[in-house]
Amino acid sequence: MNTNAADLPQPRERRRIDLLVGQYAESHRHPTNVAVHWVCVPIIVWCTLALMFVVHPWLCYAFVAASLVYYLRLSVPMAVVMAGFTAASVASFFVVPHVGWVALAAFVVTWIAQFVGHKIEGKKPSFLEDLQFLLVGPLFLLVKAFRKAGLPY
């Protein structure tokens, strides 16, 4: 039987999300640094949204909308999870007393921890080369969680 190469299944092209998370993972291999990221990245996302919300709620909403469009272009399941996280975050801003001060303090502490994690890693944070990686950090963690759970993303 003669088989044309075009008839054979082609290797799946790597999706953009896999490329971005793979690049991000290059500077996030040390177990201590990864553990620091598991704790700090969600807090940093919450703090970033809270600080924007304190400046003006619509600044926060615009950033959330733009971020969710970015996530939707990469992966619908990831966008759904991030939408849930951001919705819960924004809801919390209405009940956390002095949310701006709490966010500012937590932001400073978690970024210090992140830089300590990267010092242990021996590599500088990814976002210093490309700001896009500030949005990839949460995906790095979600991809790990989805893979561990055997869920498609």
Per-range role (PLM):
Residues N2-S27, K119-Y153:
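Membrane-proximal soluble regions of multi-pass membrane proteins
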Residues E13, L49-Y61, S89-A103:
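Helix-coil boundary and interhelical linker segments in multi-pass alpha-helical membrane proteins
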Residues L20-M52, S67-P77, R147:
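Membrane interfacial helix-start motif at the N-side
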Residues E26-V36, H56-C60, S75, V96, ...:
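Membrane-interface helix-boundary signature
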Residues P57-V95:
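Helix-adjacent hinge/juxtasegments
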Residues S67-M78, F107-K123, L141-A145:
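Transmembrane alpha-helical segments that form the membrane-embedded catalytic/substrate-channel core
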Residues M78-A87, V99-F107, I120-D130, A149-P152:
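A cytosolic-side transmembrane-helix exit/cap motif
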Residues T86-H98, Q132-F140:
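Small-residue-rich segments of transmembrane alpha-helices in multi-pass membrane proteins
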